[in-house]
């Protein structure tokens, strides 16, 4: 279910909202001429509903007027032939959260420190994320807040994710969190490939090797959990249980 939800940002926003996870005010547009909910407050940011990876998140993604928003919607819907999610742009800091399962659910938080924070609207564009070398656009620093960790765990559960997930969160000037992106299948690889998951966990001393061990442990536990319950004297099932214990590292 988690993967099927991953290509519908609107549905994920609705699920999070219904379960008490804070999100910006939002609206889904199927056509450029759809009625604009008057409760939405500018500035507004437009995102493709079914595509991740910051595709079309450009310097022109934020609209201050309805005229500009309609032009943006017309371009995105006609080019990509899919609905567009429009939400209130949250001015403030941005935190990325990674949840990794092992023996339990562990949340790792990191703030994005932008190299050029002087702009009117500071956010990560497609170019920043994929075309800028190293830390020229931003870098991660450790961040901690028990409240945000609880929100992340709840978001992970209500969207039915498994193994790992990535969440982007904005923190406004009043100290309120808003979940702006949820991804159950983010880029995966070692930190040398500049992958957020590994870069952030490396800040906490968790290597890519350790990440792989935890994921393998999850897979083994899931596989054994789906087998029939062991019968008394069933040596094959007992051997499977012993094998599971043998592969469990101390996290």
Task: For the regions a language model picked out, list residue spans one by one.
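Short beta-strand elements
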Residues: 44, 101, 112-114, 183-186
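ATP-dependent carboxylate activation and anion-phosphoryl transfer catalytic cores
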Residues: 142-251
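Active-site nucleotide/adenylate-binding loops and adjacent lid/helix of ATP-dependent enzymes
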Residues: 3-85, 91-92, 149
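Short, structured loop/turn "capping" segments at alpha-beta junctions
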Residues: 23-24, 82-84, 105-108, 162-163, ...
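Short connector loops/turns at beta-strand edges and beta->alpha or beta->beta junctions
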Residues: 49-51, 131, 185-187
């Amino acid at each position: 279910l988690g993967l099927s939800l991953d290509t519908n940002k609107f549905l994920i926003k609705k699920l999070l909202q219904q379960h008490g996870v804070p999100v910006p005010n939002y609206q889904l547009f199927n056509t450029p001429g759809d009625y604009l909910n008057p409760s939405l407050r500018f500035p507004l940011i437009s995102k493709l509903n079914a595509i991740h990876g910051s595709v079309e998140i450009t310097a022109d993604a934020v609209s201050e007027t309805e005229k500009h928003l309609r032009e943006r919607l017309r371009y995105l819907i006609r080019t990509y032939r899919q609905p567009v999610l429009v939400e209130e742009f949250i001015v403030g800091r941005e935190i990325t959260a990674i949840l990794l399962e092992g023996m339990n659910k562990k949340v790792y938080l990191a703030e994005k420190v932008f190299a050029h924070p002087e702009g009117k609207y500071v956010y990560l564009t497609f170019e920043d994320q994929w075309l800028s070398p190293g830390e020229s656009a931003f870098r991660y620093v450790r961040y901690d807040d028990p409240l945000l960790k609880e929100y992340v765990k709840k978001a992970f559960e209500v969207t039915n994710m498994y193994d790992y997930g990535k969440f982007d969160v904005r923190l406004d000037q009043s100290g309120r969190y808003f979940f702006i992106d949820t991804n159950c299948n983010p880029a995966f690889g070692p930190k040398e490939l500049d992958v957020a998951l590994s870069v952030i966990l490396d800040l906490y001393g968790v290597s890519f090797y350790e990440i792989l061990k935890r994921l393998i442990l999850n897979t083994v536990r899931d596989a054994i959990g789906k087998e029939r319950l062991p019968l008394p004297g069933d040596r094959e099932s007992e051997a499977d249980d012993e094998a599971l214990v043998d592969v469990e590292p101390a996290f």
